[in-house]
Swiss-Prot record:
Top-rank EC class of the record's enzyme: oxidoreductase
Keyword Oxidoreductase belongs to the record: yes
Taxonomic source organism: Leifsonia xyli subsp. xyli (strain CTCB07)
Domain of life: Bacteria
NCBIfam families in UniProt: hemA, PRK00045.3-4
Catalytic activity: (S)-4-amino-5-oxopentanoate + tRNA(Glu) + NADP(+) = L-glutamyl-tRNA(Glu) + NADPH + H(+)
Active site positions: C47
Protein name: Glutamyl-tRNA reductase
HAMAP family in the cross-refs: Glu_tRNA_reductase (MF_00087)
Family the entry assigns: Belongs to the glutamyl-tRNA reductase family.
Keywords assigned by UniProt, alphabetized: NADP, Oxidoreductase, Porphyrin biosynthesis
Residues that span the membrane, as ranges: none
Domain notes: Possesses an unusual extended V-shaped dimeric structure with each monomer consisting of three distinct domains arranged along a curved 'spinal' alpha-helix. The N-terminal catalytic domain specifically recognizes the glutamate moiety of the substrate. The second domain is the NADPH-binding domain, and the third C-terminal domain is responsible for dimerization.
PANTHER family xref list: GLUTAMYL-TRNA REDUCTASE (PTHR43013:SF1)
Length: 432
């Protein structure tokens, strides 16, 4: 059974998402420790959502509520969040609904800005991280691969990518009313990751030329060289803040990058009456108390999300149609898994009889390679129609009818499908 625990901008306050993101590694570890229940897990933590996709070793519908409560308790304990608060701030999707939700998420349909392009890469990286940790089951691997293919299909076949704007560009759009001339703006960029690159590109599109970069992790020099900007030297953050009209933060550090104390020198700077700080980080990069400083305005993800535009309806509808079709096909393929044990048993039964007859013919000297090949081909032909019919029944939810018929007609003993083991990361295999 697949379960998705989802807490996002649609269901939770950004403070709660902030706390969940900070504890993402602990949550992933806690979920993996429930090996008696969880056979696979992938944790997706982005700037506006926290989700855990789980493969649960319990197919009975009655166990869904118990499994969901177990997941909520594990997440709450690992993140230090009350279970009742977590329950009221999240949604739990099961099986087909969980699959369709991931396909919608990876295609940008569930984002703050519908159609934003960053989420597809974040979904892929979440899968990579889970692979490295050895927590991906075969069913989760298949689901996430379908999600990646679906997001590519949505991007290539609809206009949703252009209808929606990225978080970075939306933030700068909101800042437009505060800026009279982008070419004269002095900008401090804090962070050197993917969002920093996207922010720099968006700033340059608006004509910004004076950009300094600061990195809490010490990567400013490398970023500056590759992007043609100025690196803030060690100990130079205060001076850089004093120089800047606009500060954009987009780091993944756990602690605040900017607090009111960082602005002491900047507050004394002449000539800058108002500074705008755009916080694109989650966890938050900027202490909310910064907004109380005179002459400082703070624009954070929570504020940005309130202004997210509605996507062009046609593009969104086309994207949803693609996602719906992909989700239906995934559900159908998943349903086919239920008939596999019966098909395997039937094929084994037929080919065991065939092998026995060929062996008897050989003892009589009546066999030839051509005859054996013809008989094996005939067996395959005879099995084709029952195999097709079995999959059709499975897709219609009637897999048990085929299993019952096979048991009745052929006296087969059909074993239950084994639980898929977790997929071990390649580097772990080679290292052992």
């Amino acid at each position: 059974m697949l379960i998705c625990f989802s807490s996002s901008h649609r269901t939770a306050a950004f403070d709660l998402l902030d706390q969940l993101e900070r504890h993402a590694p602990a949550v992933a570890t806690a979920l993996a420790e429930h090996s008696e229940l969880v056979t696979g897990s992938v944790v997706l933590a982005t700037c506006n959502r926290f989700e855990a996709y789980l493969d649960i070793d319990e197919p009975l519908p009655a166990a869904r509520a118990v499994s969901a409560e177990t997941v909520i308790a594990a997440v709450g304990n690992a993140a230090g969040i009350d279970a009742d608060l977590l329950r009221s701030s999240s949604r739990v999707y099961c099986d087909d609904a969980a699959a369709e939700h991931l396909l919608s998420v990876s295609s940008g349909l569930d984002s703050v800005v519908v159609g934003e392009g960053e989420i597809a890469g974040q979904v892929r990286r979440a899968l990579t991280t889970a692979r490295q940790a050895g927590t991906v089951s075969q069913d989760l691997e298949r689901l996430f691969q379908v999600a990646s293919r679906t997001s590519r299909g949505v991007k290539n076949r609809t206009g949703i990518a252009t209808a929606g704007r990225s978080i970075v560009r939306l933030a700068l759009d909101l800042a437009e009313s505060r800026v009279s001339d982008w070419s004269r703006m002095r900008v401090l960029l804090i962070g050197t990751g993917k969002y920093a690159g996207a922010s720099l590109a968006a700033l340059r599109d608006r004509g910004v030329a004076d950009v300094q970069v600061h990195s809490p992790s010490g990567r400013a020099e490398k970023f500056a060289l590759s992007h043609g900007v100025t690196a803030v030297p060690a100990g130079g953050l205060g001076a850089a803040l004093a120089h800047a009209h606009l500060i954009v933060t987009c780091t993944t550090v756990r602690d605040y990058t900017l607090t009111p104390g960082n602005f002491g020198q900047a507050q004394q700077q002449d000539g800058i009456e108002r500074r705008l700080v755009i916080d694109l980080g989650l966890p938050r990069n900027v202490d909310s108390a910064v907004a109380e400083l005179p002459g400082v305005e703070l624009l954070d993800l929570e504020t940005i999300s309130l202004h997210a535009p509605v996507a062009e309806l046609n593009a969104a509808d086309d994207a949803r149609e693609i996602v719906g079709a992909a989700a239906a096909e995934f559900a159908a393929q998943t349903a086919e898994q239920a008939v596999k044990p019966a098909l395997i048993a039937l094929r084994k039964h037929v080919f065991d009889i065939l092998d026995a007859e060929i062996a008897r013919a050989r003892t009589r000297g009546d066999s030839s390679e051509q005859t054996e090949a013809a008989l094996r081909h005939l067996a395959g032909v005879l099995l084709h129609t029952p195999s097709v019919r079995a999959r059709e029944l499975a897709r219609a939810g009637d897999a048990q009818r085929f299993a019952d018929a096979a048991e009745t007609l052929f006296g087969l003993r059909i074993e239950e499908a084994p639980v898929h083991p977790r997929l071990i990361a390649v580097d772990r295999v080679t290292a052992s």
